Swiss-Prot record:
Region entry Disordered, spans: 432-451
Keywords, ordered alphabetically: Acetylation, Cytoplasm, Cytoskeleton, GTP-binding, Hydrolase, Magnesium, Metal-binding, Microtubule, Nucleotide-binding
UniProt EC number: 3.6.5.-
Active site residues according to the UniProt entry: E254
Assembly and oligomerization: Dimer of alpha and beta chains. A typical microtubule is a hollow water-filled tube with an outer diameter of 25 nm and an inner diameter of 15 nM. Alpha-beta heterodimers associate head-to-tail to form protofilaments running lengthwise along the microtubule wall with the beta-tubulin subunit facing the microtubule plus end conferring a structural polarity. Microtubules usually have 13 protofilaments but different protofilament numbers can be found in some organisms and specialized cells.
Residues the record marks as site: Involved in polymerization: Y451
Protein's UniProt name: Tubulin alpha-1 chain
Entry-linked SMART domains: Tubulin, Tubulin_C
Species for this entry: Gossypium hirsutum
Length: 451
């Protein structure tokens, strides 16, 4: 078995997690109390969904997940919500006081007290797996818990489970919409550890997803529930090949093999198509070629950056539903001929495709239409550097005046950590710049260095 353990940290991580588990349950026909009427074998069979759920002797299916927050309100919603019976009480870990949007509180003072408990619970989940494949980590880097405790947990996971792959689904601050003043600090400090301790990070950004909801689903004022349901479709498509059988299955470890050319360059853009409301769906023919094209549209990207400004290094297309390899090959061939979609010249093939026969499921009363086929794209593009340069710029403006720094120093950080993290990100921007440069030009310069 190739089990995956999901770790949801902080408010953003937990709320995205709620949307994901709600969707997984619907996809597998698991009721909110964990019973699965269609599953006749008691105890673990070899069905594919055991990658995400474990089964008790009483026939109850329990998610292989853990929810952590430093303050109780968000986790209490899970404890009292529709799916309260789904989770084992020990999987929901909440502290008493908030990280207060402060990376240092999440990482040093308050996070330190709770991290061993989390690792203990993760250890129990891991012992329950026959062949643990890796971790999916959900968090946001703007707040205190997601950034501070999130990076602390990742660092500790690297120590305890060094070889297991870690996929991050990370909510980054948006260009215009801000939820806290110190977002740039938290993001830079947190990215510093994401760089080292995740294998692949998928960037999400609320503003980009708001725009998709507003434009494609005609929701005038999208709520976080709307956003999370869209994000959960992406994550479900990514993990569908682990949970269902298909023609071309994609493994979690395959993402890192196919998408990451150099260890540091592992921040991905994601997009999903078709994002379409029920009213429109009946009037459109959504062929494989069409959904593939719309997945490459800059407006479909779930982070605010324009892939036309950069080059693609690799991309992974996960199709689900009524899709055959012939259509996929034709669609990919068309994409390759487009002028607007440029690939780095050292990566001529650049496509990894997966096909899964399970059509996309929609949440009843949700915004998305039920469609026959969908595609989710995870791409590694040099334009992601825009996200970092935007945050770095805001960081510099504040840090030049040392604004708000005393809150971090007071919780046991040193100013040196700020400059170290900032230098690391400057190096990352430089890395992206170099990877995007044409290799033909690079060859002439290198010849001078050889002795």
């Amino acid at each position: 078995m190739r089990e995956c353990i999901s770790i949801h940290i902080g408010q953003a991580g937990i709320q995205v997690g709620n949307a994901c588990w709600e969707l997984y349950c619907l996809e597998h026909g698991i009721q909110p109390d964990g019973q699965m009427p269609s599953d006749k074998t008691v105890g673990g069979g070899d069905d594919a969904f055991y990658t995400f759920f474990s089964e008790t002797g009483a026939g109850k299916h329990v998610p292989r997940a853990i929810f952590v927050d430093l303050e109780p309100t968000v986790i209490d919603e899970v404890r009292t919500g529709t799916y309260r019976q789904l989770f084992h009480p020990e999987q929901l870990i909440s502290g008493k006081e908030d990280a207060a949007n402060n990376f240092a509180r999440g990482h040093y003072t308050i996070g330190k007290e709770i991290v061993d408990l989390c690792l203990d619970r993760i250890r129990k989940l891991a012992d329950n797996c026959t062949g643990l494949q890796g971790f999916l980590v959900f968090s946001a880097v703007g707040g205190g818990t997601g950034s501070g405790l999130g990076s602390l947990l990742l660092e500790r996971l690297s120590v305890d489970y060094g070889k297991k792959s870690k996929l991050g689904f990370t909510v980054y601050p948006s260009p215009q919409v801000s939820t806290s003043v110190v977002e740039p600090y938290n993001s830079v400090l947190s990215t510093h550890s994401l760089l080292e301790h995740t294998d692949v990070s998928v960037l999400l950004d609320n503003e980009a997803i708001y725009d998709i909801c507003r434009r494609s689903l005609d929701i005038e004022r999208p709520t976080y529930t709307n956003l999370n349901r869209l994000v959960s479709q992406v994550i479900s498509s990514l993990t569908a090949s682990l949970r269902f059988d298909g023609a071309l299955n994609v493994d979690v470890t395959e993402f890192r093999t196919n998408l990451v050319p150099y260890p540091r360059i592992h921040f991905m853009l994601s997009s999903y198509a078709p994002v379409i409301s029920a009213e429109k769906a009946y009037h459109e023919q959504l062929s494989v070629a069409e959904i593939t094209n719309s997945a490459f549209e800059p407006s479909s990207m779930m982070a605010k950056c324009d892939p036309r400004h950069g080059k693609y290094m690799a991309c992974c297309l996960m199709y689900r539903g009524d899709v055959v390899p012939k259509d996929v090959n034709a669609a990919v061939a068309t994409i390759k001929t487009k002028r607007t979609i440029q690939f780095a010249d050292w990566c001529p093939t650049g496509f990894k495709c997966g096909i899964n026969y399970q059509p996309p499921t929609v949440v009843p009363g949700g915004d998305l239409a039920k469609v026959q086929r969908a595609v989710c794209m995870i791409s590694n593009s040099t334009s992601v550097a825009e996200v970092f340069s935007r945050i770095d710029h805001k960081f510099d403006l504040m840090y030049a005046k040392r604004a708000f720094v005393h809150w971090y120093v007071g919780e046991g950080m040193e100013e040196g950590e700020f400059s170290e993290a900032r230098e690391d990100l400057a190096a990352l921007e430089k890395d992206y710049e170099e990877v995007g440069a044409d290799s033909a030009e690079g060859d002439e310069e290198d010849e001078g260095d050889e002795y």
